[in-house]
From Swiss-Prot:
Forms a 10-stranded antiparallel beta-barrel structure able to accommodate a hydrophobic ligand in its interior. In fact, this fold hosts the heme group, which is located in a wide surface cleft. SUPFAM superfamilies: Lipocalins (SSF50814). Homodimer. Heme-binding protein able to scavenge peroxynitrite and to protect free L-tyrosine against peroxynitrite-mediated nitration, by acting as a peroxynitrite isomerase that converts peroxynitrite to nitrate. Therefore, this protein likely plays a role in peroxynitrite sensing and in the detoxification of reactive nitrogen and oxygen species (RNS and ROS, respectively). Is able to bind nitric oxide (NO) in vitro, but may act as a sensor of peroxynitrite levels in vivo. This is Peroxynitrite isomerase. It comes from Clavibacter michiganensis subsp. michiganensis (strain NCPPB 382). Heme b binds at H190. Keywords: Heme, Iron, Isomerase, Metal-binding. PANTHER family: PEROXYNITRITE ISOMERASE THAP4, THAP4 PROTEIN. Its cofactor is heme b. Belongs to the nitrobindin family. It comes from the Bacteria.
Length: 199
């Protein structure tokens, strides 16, 4: 059973099953040139909110070294229902809202439900290696399907052109899979993991 925290903005209810801290393991397997890189890793994922209609997201992964855990990769970003921003939303930048805050009740959020019975979502992620991704997709029950709508790379970033991600709640664990198009290759399997709720 998914518990909805008191004070959660109504727009976040479809994503509320993600809230909290998750820890577990995963594996990356991807061809780099003539070699296939295969590595197991530990992972800590956090979804939180600060009263605004988006989830704060961070993921940190490590590999086991001879002297203990060694930092591997990290990413951070924001998850929200996909809708048009209104005068009731802050921004751009630090500009305050000029109207009433939208979608504050369950009935108002229901108007955002799509024809498939889910809710459209967008996810903005930033990687410290010079890559930013904008994903679009949908959340339906306890499953999220995402595909990149845009990828932005700095001049020094590695070749990376697109991705898909799948998240699902299975037996109270969060399972995920991430396919990428990178290093001159088409979209293919890249990494997956299983994390358990720890906080």
């Amino acid at each position: 059973m998914i518990e909805i925290p008191t004070g959660l903005p109504a727009e976040l209810v479809p994503l509320s099953w993600l809230l909290g801290v998750w820890e577990g393991t995963g594996v990356v397997e991807y061809a780099v040139g003539d070699d296939v890189v295969r590595r197991e890793f530990g992972q800590r994922i956090s979804f939180s909110h600060d009263g605004l209609p988006h989830l704060n997201y961070s993921s940190y992964a490590w590999v086991e070294g001879d002297d203990g855990p060694v930092p591997f990769v990290t990413e951070t970003g924001y998850w929200r229902l996909r809708r048009r921003v209104t005068d009731g939303d802050p921004g751009p930048a630090m500009l305050p809202p000029t109207g009433e805050r939208p979608f504050t009740t369950a009935d108002e959020v229901e108007t955002l439900r799509n024809a498939d019975g889910g809710f459209d979502v967008e996810v903005a992620l930033v990687h410290p290696g010079g890559v930013s991704e904008l994903y679009v997709g949908q959340v339906k029950s306890a499953r999220i399907d995402l595909a990149t709508d845009a990828v932005l790379r700095t001049e020094g970033a590695k070749a990376y052109t697109g991705a898909t991600r799948l998240y699902g709640l299975v037996e109270r664990d969060l399972l995920w899979a991430w396919d990428i198009a990178a290093l001159g290759q088409p979209l293919r399997t890249h990494a997956s993991g299983r994390v358990s709720h720890v906080d």
